[in-house]
Amino acid sequence: MSEIAKEMNKFLREKDPVIFSLLSDFGREIYMPKGIISQSAEAKLHAYECNATIGIAKEDGGPMYLPSIKKFFNNLTPSEIFPYATPYGLPELRKLWREKIISENELKNKEISLPVVTHAMTNGLMLTGDLFIDKGDEIYLPNMMWGNYNLIYRIRYKANIVNYDFFNSSLTKFNVAALKEALNNCNKEKVVLLFNFPNNPTGYTPTQKEANAITEILLDLAESG
């Protein structure tokens, strides 16, 4: 394992051992090389003609570009349009996003990292798989689910998908009882439960009452160990 990965694991283990315990083997080994970040930062400060770290040509203090492309953008500057996007999203956006998360989820005085921008939902799901899913893990999903979950988690990550009935018998409500039964039947220490609402393909979103019931189930399971 890389020394950088060991350092990151040590930091995370001390800061939040619960989150560290959830990481997959791959999640504990992956890291961002320090050279890429530091060299890119230096280039932004000192590269006047050509930034060789990403192969970008500069002109008049900004990136070289074609006016025929620039004309399709309104109030954005060339520096906001043409260079490579940052790997995690714009820092200003991520800071505002974190403030929104804290204000809407009663997290005042809680320390959380900056959220990360992903390239649409599928990329986010695969990053989640990279960081948290090991071969043989069980992922609990409703029987009415997006077909790509099979490709992502069962085929790519070799996890076992466990289904529960999404609707009750009258097909009018989220089946809280079926979810509870499925989770109670799990005999593994690690449980992965994936929610994505509105549900694909049904379009259904649980009511506030159903959401509270789901929360109660998860809290009971967590407290029971």
Mark where each language-model region is.
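Generic N-terminal amphipathic, Lys/Arg-enriched alpha-helix
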Residues: 5-25
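Short, flexible segments with low predicted structural confidence
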Residues: 11-15, 68-69, 110-112, 124-125
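Conserved core of the PLP fold type I
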Residues: 80-225
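N-terminal small-domain helix-loop-helix segment of the aminotransferase-like
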Residues: 2, 6, 25-119
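Helix N-terminus capping/helix-initiation residues
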Residues: 23-24, 66, 175, 207
